[in-house]
């Protein structure tokens, strides 16, 4: 069943046809249609109708919005349809905005498709007839799972295409053509904005079953150094084979990332969680050493925090994400260690209380444990960790001593307040009911005030 946006696209195409033009679905919509993937982002391109006539047609169908006048892109209010005129682009500088755009309604479909990045994205589908135009072998590449650039000359003008190739490879499980890999090696990514980088990175992290492919392909393209140098530093950092049969820290991180992708739907903060999985072992390159013939990475979870902070700040100014990721990095080893050591309840409560998100911390611990190429997929620590988390959540759901309780007892806010509330919180973690905890807190205040 067609939604209102598809219906509007067909209406536009009908009006355009009456004026002697043609309307095509373009870009990812055609690709996803052929792959059997739902895509509600409707992009259409209008050929054979001048801009003034197109605006007249659109005005008869609704309120026209100009989304990019210089790009020849329009919309209709209340509809999610991008309506574009054919255009040619040429780079005028290194920045992503440094392009000269020339719109030409009579450019022709083949020349218009020439500006597309990959053959699979250069396919065009006639909105009215369903005819698919394929000028560069896109259907064959799509069927064979190949990501191949359309035109070498135009491809190198937008360095973001290096990352787009990598994220498409991760999302669709495709391989990048050797000639596209070779071309990507020559491109300079330094002028890209952090927003464009994170846009492609997060598509891989959030949409791919195997986000590791994104980084594996960037490694093949020799493009880790500009935006992801910390990832490059993981390569060839050894790990003890007895605990890590998968090999170096790079291999481990790739496996953990894929395990995390299988768990992200269960995470409270799935996007943050995927970043945490990515960076959790960034401390190993700076701590790994061989002592008496054995490989150790002592304190890597703490020593990695400045490395993680630098990495995150390069990609985003989102403080909540940084706080979450740093906290998860510091604590990522604790749950499995406590479970393996049969630690007491108090130790678990302390760790959960230090965590920004205990539920996600356990998911990260699971991904870390399973990301080791183990033949056995059992995770024996999971039951006790879940039991301890249930205890913690139960304690946090109970009534507890708050500031207003102290005020009601006649205690004026002052220096002892925080100390008293901290003590009350420790009693809460120990399972002491509020009615028993409050007298103990008040007694502490009296003792402290009298000393």
Outline where the language-model segments fall:
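Catalytic cores of the polymerase beta-like nucleotidyltransferase superfamily
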Residues: 1-451
């Amino acid at each position: 069943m067609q939604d209102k946006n598809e219906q509007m696209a067909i209406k536009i195409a009908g009006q355009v046809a009456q004026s002697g033009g043609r309307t095509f679905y373009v870009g990812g919509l055609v690709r996803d249609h052929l792959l059997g993937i739902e895509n509600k982002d409707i992009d259409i391109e209008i050929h054979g109708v001048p801009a003034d006539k197109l605006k007249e047609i659109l005005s008869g169908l609704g309120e026209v919005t100009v989304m990019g006048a210089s790009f020849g892109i329009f919309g209709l209010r209340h509809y999610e349809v991008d309506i574009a005129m054919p255009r040619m682009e040429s780079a005028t500088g290194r920045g992503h905005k440094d392009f000269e755009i020339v719109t030409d309604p009579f450019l022709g479909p083949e020349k218009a498709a020439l500006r597309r990045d990959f053959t699979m994205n250069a396919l065009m589908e006639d909105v009215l007839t369903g005819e698919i135009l394929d000028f560069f072998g896109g259907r064959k590449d799509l069927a064979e799972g190949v990501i191949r650039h359309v035109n070498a000359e135009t491809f190198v003008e937008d360095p973001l295409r290096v990352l787009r190739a990598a994220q498409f490879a991760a999302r669709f499980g495709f391989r990048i053509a050797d000639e596209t890999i070779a071309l990507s090696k020559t491109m300079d990514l330094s002028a890209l904005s952090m927003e464009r980088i994170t846009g492609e990175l997060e598509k891989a992290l959030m949409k791919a079953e195997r986000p590791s492919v994104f980084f594996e392909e960037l490694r093949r393209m020799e493009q880790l150094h500009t935006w992801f140098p910390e990832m490059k530093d993981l390569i060839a950092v050894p790990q003890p084979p007895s605990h890590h049969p998968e090999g170096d820290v790079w291999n481990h991180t790739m496996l953990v990332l894929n395990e995390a992708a299988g768990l992200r739907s269960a995470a409270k903060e799935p996007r943050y969680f995927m970043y945490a999985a990515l960076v959790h072992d960034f401390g190993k390159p700076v701590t790994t050493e061989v002592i008496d013939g054995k490989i150790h990475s002592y304190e890597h979870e703490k020593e990695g925090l400045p490395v993680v902070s630098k990495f995150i700040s390069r990609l985003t100014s989102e403080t909540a994400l940084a706080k979450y990721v740093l906290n998860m990095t510091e604590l990522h080893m604790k749950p499995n260690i406590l479970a393996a050591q049969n630690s007491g309840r108090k130790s678990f409560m302390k760790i959960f209380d230090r965590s920004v998100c205990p539920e996600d911390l356990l998911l990260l611990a699971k991904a870390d444990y399973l990301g080791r190429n183990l033949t056995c997929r059992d995770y024996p620590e999971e039951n006790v960790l879940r039991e301890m988390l249930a205890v913690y959540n139960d304690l946090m759901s109970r009534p507890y001593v708050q500031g207003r309780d102290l005020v009601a007892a006649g205690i004026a806010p002052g220096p002892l307040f925080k100390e008293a509330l901290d003590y009350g919180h420790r009693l809460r973690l120990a399972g002491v009911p509020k009615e028993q905890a409050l007298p103990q807190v008040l007694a502490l205040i009296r003792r402290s005030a009298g000393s």
